[in-house]
Each structure stands twice: as C-alpha cells, then as structure tokens.
Amino acid sequence: IEEFLREFNGEGIQHIALICDDLVACWDKLKANSVPFMTAPPETYYAMLHERLPGHGQPVDELKTRGILLDGTTEGGEPRLLLQIFAQAQVGPVFFEFIQRKGDYKDGFGEGNFKALFESMERDQVERGVLKVEEKV
C-alpha cells in the first residue's frame, strides 16, 4: 500500500480482482502465457490448512504447487470457501487478484489468509531455527 500511495501521490485503484470458475485451470492458462505470480507462501501454510479449515475438501497439493491461498469456513459441514492468488504488479504498483468462490461464500475478501500467512511464516521460521519460541514460566 505504501508503494502505491508514494507512486501515485495518494489514493486510487491498488488492485483489480477477477473471478474465475476454476482457479487452478485459470492459473495454468495464465502461467502458460507468462503471467508472473507473487511468491507462494511457505510449506507450513498448506500444512496448517486442515487445522484452520477442517473438511475443506480442496486438493492441497494442487493449491500448494500453484501458491493458491484458501480461506473461508467449514462450519456446519458445508464448506464456504475463497481461493485466491495474486499476480505480480505489472502496471506500476497495480496488481491483479484472481479468485474463486465455492459454496455460499459471499462475505469477506480472504481476511483469514493474512493471519494464516503470518502464522505459517512464523512456524516455518521456528522449524528452521531462525525464530526461538520463548517458554512462559
């Protein structure tokens, strides 16, 4: 956001979101046409998906291979999901977001992914010994 504000001297359109019926197939077509995507989250993000969204029913290996994020809810046994991926900025700091909504997912814009990404990066750092977990006494 900071880069955008600096580049354009204020507010404006930061990104453009496009909805897809099949985000995995969409990603494959975009990648075949050399669209660059933002760096995929660490392995731990995908390892934590079943904890965060039990019973989500999505092909984690396909999501992980492509760096696709998954958010939503599985409460009541009916997954309501948002799949999302971000292309690298190609028009100044403006970037494209590609999404797919599944079930009756109408609310939200992937807010749960912000927390999940942070937690997965932290877990990855702990596993690599870069970050030490302090024990509470």
Locate each region found by the language model.
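Glyoxalase I/VOC metalloenzyme domain signal
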Residues: 1-137
